[in-house]
UniProtKB/Swiss-Prot annotation:
PROSITE patterns with a match to the protein in the record: LON_N, TPR, TPR_REGION, ZF_RING_1, ZF_RING_2
Span of zinc fingers (RING-type): 159-197, 461-499
Name this polypeptide is given: LON peptidase N-terminal domain and RING finger protein 3
Disulfide bridge positions per record: none
Gene field: Lonrf3
Length: 753
């Protein structure tokens, strides 16, 4: 909306003869005033007046004309524009004028609710979101005393979907862990990881767990297995919260089956076992609300907000209870909190709009106080920086049935109970910060105390018998070190413990580390983790040495600059290739086999360019020759050969010898090129497909320490046995190598003729 349109609408609203009121100025910091009264403008409030915003009424006002739909539409557009631009105080005045001309509906206040919610500072949500009313003091005290002696649960042991204690933890192939029942809720096709957003069907298919009979067009049933290590550890460290989490899921099931009283009993027992769990209080509040015990529902919602100030559902259920009890102002504020936490939630927006409409239906005194509360929100909004931080979306993933909003029932009871309050309307009591509860009843529990009952032996890999390093949980629920699991899969595509088939894990070779276990070890076993990491880094450093213990592939002849595709199927070479990639060298040696020594004395270093894995664990490696070497000492490591080596290079010549070498180089190149072009077309195509085209002639044949590339290409395609080619690899004289190639080409040409 441009300035001209705004000016026209302001002018039009003035012509309507409305009873314009000025909003009270915000209080100066440090001043205090009675409810509905400003210290700077005490004359702005008249006890018997009907001014909703506490402003002074003009002495004379024109009689209101019958508004037309166009006039009301202009006023609504003007109010929405002011609210969108951040001028909430002016927008509230225009909304009030509009309410005097027509009966507002909830949908017309959507923009106002959105802007009011945006004006709620994040600091207020964190520290001012769970006020302690007198009716809830006893419940807070009781919960605080119980929570003060309860063990504090590490945040890593909480499900990131329901934000409660992990119950039957299932670790997905992406590395994230959730409650089993949380993953099983909802339509199978829509289930996703709450952290990375990957569909569960894709994760299960990648891990081979989505199996079983199914109808045409239906997704495969998900087979979720509990993480054995994590489940046992949670049961050992936190037996109370673990049992409470099970009771919570049982209570949710009973609630869905409309056995509300039985569900309440389950939750009462769960709260006794885990008084620190905000989710228990939040869900029990919903149960109380269903049983029409609204005071108890408010009690539990207050405690849930206290334990988790940024929890959406706790605030929503608190607002739900307040609205039913007729506390319109407090309910509106809580609904605004909800919209601020999750602006996309339609229920929260519609309830906030409806509560805004309910303000005029209450007493004049309450309406004035509520309007002043909205005005204070507007003042705080205008003092904020325009580029506010992104809101943190905090939707607990509990069952939608347990979180359903009985809107009509709530509104009906609220209207019946909305009455004039005789006492003076004061501000809500100051809300205590999160650290005051439950610590106000005693010292906050030490996180290390419950976790001190386990040691590194609880987190040992069953394969290497050492502390987990880069732990990976298989779809069958067992956990191993990443390197240990990969080595086992080289030999057999089954879980080392339960023998469950893990065939689908092989093609991608992408393993995600278990986030919870990795953070747990790094946080609570720092010294053991540091030592384990040191051992791993020493192993990697040793494997990356390209002079000592260099991995040797005993197979065929390889030459510098010449491609060498390999088919890898033996377990020892699977491990060797993977280590070459992991260390970053991507290099290994290639030697011919020897019946006496194991492999010959000379070979060539190959560099891995690409690897393609197959579903059965085999792979095709695209490699190319780099440098020649001589074996000094042979050895073995984990089933494959190794060697200490030294690299060899051609000896350079100068002067007349260099000129003679240049002439010989050009002559042999022309001879090799003529021989290649004389071959049959089918044979030439096979050579080109396997080795590529013949390299160009070098201007300086000695620029490369291994000699010209075309020499090695020619040796690779010549019809010679590997044993006959080996001496060329060991030669350190380019002249001798060129003379040898010339003699072979001459011999082949004579035989062809």
């Amino acid at each position: 909306m441009d300035s001209l349109q705004t000016a026209q609408m302001v002018s039009l609203s003035a012509e309507l003869g409305s009873n314009n009121l000025e909003l009270a100025e915000p209080e100066e910091p440090g001043t205090s005033a009675a409810a509905g009264q400003s210290a700077a403008h005490p004359e702005e409030v008249t006890p018997e007046g009907s001014q909703a915003l506490g402003a002074q009424e003009p002495e004379q006002s024109l009689p209101l004309a019958v508004p037309t739909p166009l006039e009301c539409k202009v006023l609504l557009t003007q109010a929405d524009a002011l609210a969108s631009e951040g001028h909430l105080r002016e927008a509230l005045e225009v909304y009030r004028q509009l309410s005097e001309r027509q009966q507002l509906v909830a949908e017309q206040l959507e923009q106002l609710v959105r802007c009011l919610a945006d004006s709620v500072p994040q600091e207020e949500l964190a520290s001012d979101s769970s006020g302690t009313s007198s009716c809830c003091a006893a419940a807070l005290k009781e919960a605080g005393e119980a929570a003060a002696v309860a063990p504090e649960v590490w945040d890593g042991f909480k499900c990131k979907k329901c934000h409660g204690f992990l119950s039957d933890p299932v670790s997905l192939w992406c590395g994230h862990t959730f409650c089993k029942l949380c993953l099983e809720r909802g339509r199978a096709a829509d289930r996703r990881c709450a952290l990375c957003g990957v569909k569960l069907s894709a994760l299960m298919a990648a891990s081979g767990r989505a199996r079983g009979p199914r109808r045409a067009g239906q997704p495969a049933p998900l087979q979720l297995r509990v993480n054995v290590v994590l489940s046992g550890l949670l049961g050992k460290l936190f037996p109370g919260p673990a049992r409470a989490s099970q009771l919570r899921h049982e209570g949710n099931r009973l609630f869905r089956e409309h056995q509300v009283e039985a569900a309440l009993l389950k939750y009462n027992e769960a709260v006794r076992l885990a008084p620190n769990d905000h989710l228990l209080y939040s869900n029990r509040s919903q149960i109380y609300f269903t049983l029409e015990s609204h005071e108890d529902a408010l009690h539990d919602a207050e405690i849930a907000c206290k334990l988790r100030p940024m929890g959406f559902k706790a605030h929503f259920r608190k607002a739900q209870a307040l609205a039913t009890l007729g506390k319109v102002k407090e309910a509106l504020k809580e609904f605004l909190y909800c919209v601020s936490l999750d602006g996309k939630n339609k229920s929260a927006r519609s309830e906030a709009q409806r509560e805004n409409l309910e303000l005029p239906h209450c007493s004049n005194q309450e309406g004035a106080a509520a309007a002043e509360e909205s005005s204070s929100l507007a003042n705080s909004a205008q003092g904020k920086v325009s580029s506010k931080e992104d809101r943190k979306k905090d939707q607990e993933g509990e069952d939608r049935d347990a979180a359903s909003v009985r809107t009509g029932k709530c509104q009906e009871k609220k209207r019946n109970r909305c009455q004039i309050e005789t006492q003076e309307d004061t501000e809500l009591p100051n809300k205590v910060s999160k650290q005051d509860f439950p610590a106000e009843q005693g010292a906050k529990p030490d996180l290390s105390n419950p976790l001190g009952s386990f040691d590194a032996s609880d987190l040992e890999c069953s394969l290497c018998m050492r502390l987990f390093y880069e732990p990976v949980t298989t779809p069958c629920g067992h956990t191993f070190c990443l390197k240990c699991l990969e080595r086992c899969l080289d030999h057999n595509a089954k879980c080392p413990l339960c023998k469950d088939v893990l065939l689908q894990c092989l093609p991608s070779r992408k393993y995600s580390k278990n986030v919870i276990l990795e953070e747990l070890i790094a946080t609570f076993l720092p010294e053991e983790f540091k030592e384990r990491k040191r051992l791993y880094e020493e192993e990697m450093e040793e494997l990356s040495n390209l002079n000592k213990n260099v991995p040797i592939f005993v197979c065929t002849m390889a030459y510098p600059t010449v491609p060498c595709p390999l088919h890898i199927f033996e377990p020892c070479y699977r491990l060797m290739i993977r280590r070459c990639i992991e260390t970053g060298t991507r290099q290994f040696g290639m030697c011919l086999g020897d019946p006496v020594k194991g492999f010959v004395e000379y070979g060539c270093i190959l560099e891995i360019r690409n690897v393609q894995f197959f579903s059965d664990g085999r792979s095709v490696v695209d490699s190319i020759g780099k440098r020649r070497f001589k074996v000094l000492h042979q050895g073995q490591r984990d089933g494959y050969n190794t060697a200490d080596i030294e690299y060899i290079e051609d000896q350079k010549v100068q002067g007349d010898d260099c000129a003679e070498l240049m002439g010989l180089h050009n002559c042999v190149y022309e001879q090799a090129s003529s021989w290649f072009h004389s071959l049959k077309a089918s044979l030439k195509n096979r050579i080109l497909n396997h080795f590529g085209p013949m390299p160009e002639k070098d201007e300086d044949p000695q620029v490369n320490p291994n000699g010209p590339a075309w020499c090695w290409w020619t040796l690779a395609v010549l019809p010679l046995e590997s044993r006959a080619q080996l001496p060329f690899l060991a030669m350190r004289s380019l002249k001798d190598r060129l003379n040898g190639i010339r003699r072979i080409l001459a011999f082949i040409s004579r035989n062809q003729n």
